[in-house]
Curated annotation (Swiss-Prot):
Gene: JJJ2
Protein name: J protein JJJ2
Disulfide bonds: none
GO molecular function, one term: Hsp70 protein binding
SMART domains named in the record: DnaJ
This protein's UniProt keywords: Chaperone, Cytoplasm, Nucleus, Phosphoprotein
Biased composition regions of type Basic and acidic residues, renumbered to the chain: 269-282
Coiled coil: none
Taxonomic lineage from the root: Eukaryota, Fungi, Dikarya, Ascomycota, Saccharomycotina
């Protein structure tokens, strides 16, 4: 059997041959060409159509890569309406078709063919080529990323080989494990194992005695022990969740109890009666009892409910909860930061006494500082008639005294008293009105100017005077920029006017507006002509060339506006003449 590719291409346009639209770039064209050329090359495929299609792909690529030919082809596509053509969806899908070779023997169907089973190496049949190659559907459905456990593999292999030797004994491993690896052992709400009829059949056939769950979990070779050990963590978590739910229910019942609560003796009697009712005699239901004993798990809870029942006033369920809360509180206090000094400290007798002592010391220090300052020679207070004077110091009444041992200043120097009088007093703003006069009165030593500086100053002043001369005003030159903002009247709509008289009136009104605008433009141009003749000597110099250019640009804009106005007048006259002749 040999496989042959059956190519299918959309040969409507060169773009559709390559599986592209007309908006495709050169890189996309090249990529699709390489892809199709690899698939349709005659050396690669044995199809009869591949050679013809390969030539078509090469021709399409040669045209679309040449810029001139591509432009012509795109123009032709727009004319034909194929510029937005999309390639067909069922094309560019290469299907493989099985081709029967001559002299081949008829083969069996897929259902009749022999499939090699997924077995270990030691269990596979001898010889090669016995079975058919595995297809994707016949492959193993075991997940690839599943973790491999060597012990479980050996245990499963041991029980399977034991089963084959006994010929008829039940496969224990297959009964205890589901197909997906999950255990058939299930937990009930009460924390006990659920039994099945399959388990009862196993124990009847094997004739084994009843063991507790502890014996199975301790035996590493037993399949039941492995199944239970695999789910110990899940069962413990389920048991913890059930205990938490029971604790919450008991707390709700405790807080919602009425005053008619039963005594502890009555509660113990009720508990004993409920336990007796829940127990079933082994004679009445022996099979259920044996099944529960076989799969009974040890209790994982270490909390006793009797302590909470005895002490209903305590918010904790038992002493272990209380111990946990106490240790958590102590740990939190241990790592707590120190109290902030900004926070208010509760007033006590000891703290008040300390603050009062500090306050008295500060007041005494302030009084001593004031006395020392009064005794100093540098500060002398003037005599005041009133004895009950305030402690506030007035700057105006103070006088500064020279210390002993200091030389007398010269008469030309400014004394401290004069300086004190000249300085601004307290709360007086410094006025800067007479600062210019004071600066002019100061005699500064000025260096005499050199000849070079005199020449530079003269040239600079001359240039400034020349600039002032060569900069006449815009009004003197006849430039009025406001005239450029004047709007030219628009051509009226004569199609809506049917009467000839009204048409004449509209034409006259338009002509009058245009004539007024022409008159203003001619006046401005006449002023410009006079200004050019007047300032001809000034404008022809080197400094005023740029100014002259701006004047000429203004004249040009005036003439452009005048030309537009005349063209509109010509259009109106043409329309009016046609209406009068009756052509329109």
């Amino acid at each position: 059997m040999s496989q042959v590719i059956e190519p299918q291409l959309d040969r409507t346009t060169y773009y559709s041959i390559l599986g592209l639209t007309s908006n495709a770039t050169s890189s996309e064209v090249h990529k699709s060409y390489l892809k199709l050329a690899r698939l349709l090359h005659p050396d690669k495929t044995k199809s009869d159509k591949s050679e013809e299609l390969f030539k078509a792909v090469v021709h399409a690529h040669s045209i679309l890569t040449d810029e001139d030919q591509k432009l012509r082809y795109d123009r032709d596509l727009k004319i034909k309406g194929l510029h937005t053509y999309q390639p067909k969806k069922n094309c560019h899908i290469f299907k493989t078709k099985a081709k029967e070779s001559q002299g081949a023997s008829p083969t069996l169907g897929q259902s009749e063919a022999y499939h090699r089973q997924n077995k270990p190496y030691e269990q596979q049949p001898y010889g090669f080529g016995v079975g058919k190659k595995m297809t994707s559907s016949s492959k193993s459905k075991v997940p690839i990323f599943k973790s491999f456990n060597l012990k479980s593999y050996q245990r499963n292999h041991y029980y399977s080989s034991k089963k084959e030797r006994k010929h008829g004994s039940p496969d224990i491993d297959s009964l205890f494990h589901e197909t997906n690896g999950a255990s058939k052992v299930r937990m009930t709400d009460a924390g006990k194992m659920d039994t099945n009829s399959q388990f009862q059949e196993i124990w009847e056939i094997l004739g084994k005695n009843v063991y507790t769950h502890k014996s199975y979990s301790e035996d590493p070779n037993s399949c039941l022990g492995s199944a239970l050990s695999d789910h110990e963590e899940e069962e413990e978590e389920a048991g913890k969740q059930q205990q938490q739910q029971q604790q919450q229910q008991q707390q709700q019942q405790h807080y919602g109890m009425t005053s008619k609560s039963s005594s502890p003796d009555e509660e113990q009697k009720d508990n004993k009666e409920s336990k007796r009712e829940s127990r079933v005699s082994p004679e009445e239901n022996g099979e259920e009892e044996t099944g529960h004993k076989q799969f009974k798990l040890p209790k994982t809870s270490t909390f006793s409910s009797g302590s909470h029942d005895s002490n209903l006033q305590s918010p904790f369920y038992n002493h272990e909860y209380r111990h946990y809360a106490r240790s958590k509180f102590e740990c939190k206090n241990q790592f707590r930061k120190s109290v902030s000094p900004i926070k208010e400290i509760p007033a006590t007798t000891s703290t008040n006494e300390g603050w009062n002592i500090l306050r008295d010391i500060i007041e005494k220090l302030n009084i001593s500082n004031v006395d020392d300052r009064n005794k100093d020679l540098l500060f002398r207070r003037d005599e005041i008639g009133d004895k009950n004077h305030s402690d506030s110091i007035d700057i105006e009444n103070l006088s500064i005294k020279e210390p002993k041992g200091m030389k007398r200043r010269k008469k030309d120097d400014i004394s401290l008293e004069e300086l004190f009088q000249s300085l601004p007093r307290e709360k007086d703003y410094f006025m800067m009105d007479a600062i210019n006069d004071s600066l002019e009165s100061i005699n500064l030593f000025k260096k005499p100017k050199t000849t070079q500086s005199h020449e530079q100053g003269g040239t600079f002043a001359q240039a400034e005077s020349n600039r002032a001369k060569f900069k006449p005003l815009l009004e003197q030159c006849g430039i009025t920029p406001e005239i450029l903002d004047l709007q030219i009247p628009e051509i009226p709509e004569f199609d809506a006017v049917a009467d000839l008289e009204t048409l004449k009136l509209n034409v006259q009104l338009f002509n009058n507006q245009c004539n007024k605008l022409k008159e203003t433009i001619h006046q401005v141009s006449l002023q410009r002509l006079r200004a050019d003749t007047q300032f001809s000597d000034m404008l022809t110099q080197k400094q005023s060339i740029m100014v002259w250019k701006t004047y000429l640009e203004f004249d040009k804009s005036l003439m452009d506006k005048l030309n537009i106005l005349q063209e509109r007048q010509m259009q109106v006259i043409k329309i009016f003449s046609e209406r009068c002749d009756g052509k329109v």
